[in-house]
């Protein structure tokens, strides 16, 4: 029954209707036979009402030192992370970024990010494979403790997400929220290479290459300055505005010279010279955005007052995405994401029906079959002692 319940949730992400009750509507334009034939609306709502992922009676109270804001869904998310890391071998290039699970209800750790398509919700830090969007590890941001902001939050997040990939020489790409010279040197000690944009006012960023207004006037588009400390290279590239990067992966220059395409005032796009780090940053930074884009196509996340159920939806989305990426690598003829999800729904719901027949159950015992009826001869109708009214 729970498999059919999960199958219905996945199907609702494929065929989207404004309200859940419409899947059982009598209107021929709205009625969904794959859902209504499995179980009644009442049964579906009962399961969803009493659905839990942990024993709430064992949860630590709020005033306890072990209180966990996501206790109800913690073990479920940890299981998904463990399976995602065990069943897939990551490629070299990874990216770190944040994603949002939509939620507008009252919540102590609800966040706002103005540059994201989903501006209000639950923020998660995510480590993804850059080329495929495979979600390898994620961490729910539970807000600051008390009124004090956490020191070195970005550095702590990067270390937490990359702890299991140390000494494997992965290349991590991140934006200027996380990047700082001290962090990159610490990652290099653990055999992790990194590249990313950086804020010019970061501590230890070389002030010699910070572009002033006068320096910008004397530079052409595509010019850049650089300096290095060991394997750590800092770059200041002038596009339409200054762009600052640091990297332990790339040299300051390459042969042939690196370039990126930019829009031109003349009309066609033109090649602009740039540091080698900028080319790979544009290529490999979008792993988390890629996973969000794929999941949003058939998103199963629906409105709910309980935030932990939103995280349940997110975990299910991650499981579907990661399993699909693994399937594409092992299948002889990979199919598209829609057909893959439909196959999952069929597997979870095939041969199952939990609808009860209307009316009261009969109190009369079932009549035993007379074997004489099967001998190919005619027999007179036996009159029973108790007759029913027609």
Cite the ranges covered by each PLM segment.
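Acidic, contiguous segments within the catalytic cores of piggyBac-derived transposases
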Residues: 1-390
């Amino acid at each position: 029954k729970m498999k059919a319940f999960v199958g219905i949730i996945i199907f609702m992400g494929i065929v989207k209707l404004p309200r859940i009750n419409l899947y059982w509507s009598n209107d021929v334009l709205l009625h969904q036979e794959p859902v209504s034939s499995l179980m009644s609306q009442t049964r579906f709502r009962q399961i969803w009402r009493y659905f839990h992922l942990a024993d709430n009676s064992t949860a630590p109270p709020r005033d306890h030192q072990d209180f966990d804001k996501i206790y109800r869904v913690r073990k479920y998310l940890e299981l998904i992370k463990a399976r995602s890391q065990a069943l897939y071998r990551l490629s070299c290039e990874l990216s770190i970024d944040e994603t949002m699970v939509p939620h507008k209800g009252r919540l102590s750790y609800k966040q706002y990010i103005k540059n994201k398509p989903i501006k209000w919700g639950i923020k998660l830090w995510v480590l993804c494979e850059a080329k495929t969007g495979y979600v390898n590890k994620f961490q729910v941001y539970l807000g600051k403790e008390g009124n004090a902001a956490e020191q070195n939050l970005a550095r702590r997040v990067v270390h937490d997400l990359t702890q299991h990939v140390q000494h494997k020489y992965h290349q991590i790409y991140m934006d200027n929220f996380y990047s700082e010279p001290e962090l990159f040197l610490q990652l290099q000690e653990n055999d992790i290479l990194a590249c990313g944009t950086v804020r010019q006012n970061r501590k230890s960023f070389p002030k010699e290459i910070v572009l002033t207004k006068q320096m910008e006037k004397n530079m052409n588009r595509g010019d850049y300055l650089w300096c290095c400390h060991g394997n750590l290279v800092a770059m200041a590239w002038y596009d339409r505005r200054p762009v600052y990067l640091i990297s332990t992966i790339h040299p300051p220059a390459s042969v042939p010279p690196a370039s990126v395409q930019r829009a031109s005032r003349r009309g066609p796009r033109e090649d602009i010279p740039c540091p080698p780090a900028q080319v790979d940053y544009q290529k490999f930074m979008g792993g988390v955005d890629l996973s969000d884009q794929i999941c949003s196509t058939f998103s199963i996340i629906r409105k709910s007052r309980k935030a932990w159920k939103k995280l349940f939806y997110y975990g299910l989305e991650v499981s579907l995405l990661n399993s699909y990426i693994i399937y594409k690598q092992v299948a002889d003829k990979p199919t598209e994401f829609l057909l893959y999800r439909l196959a999952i729904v069929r597997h979870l719901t095939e041969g199952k029906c939990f609808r009860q027949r209307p009316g009261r159950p009969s109190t009369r015992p079932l009549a035993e079959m007379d074997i004489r009826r099967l001998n190919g001869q005619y027999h007179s109708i036996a009159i029973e002692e108790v007759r029913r009214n027609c």
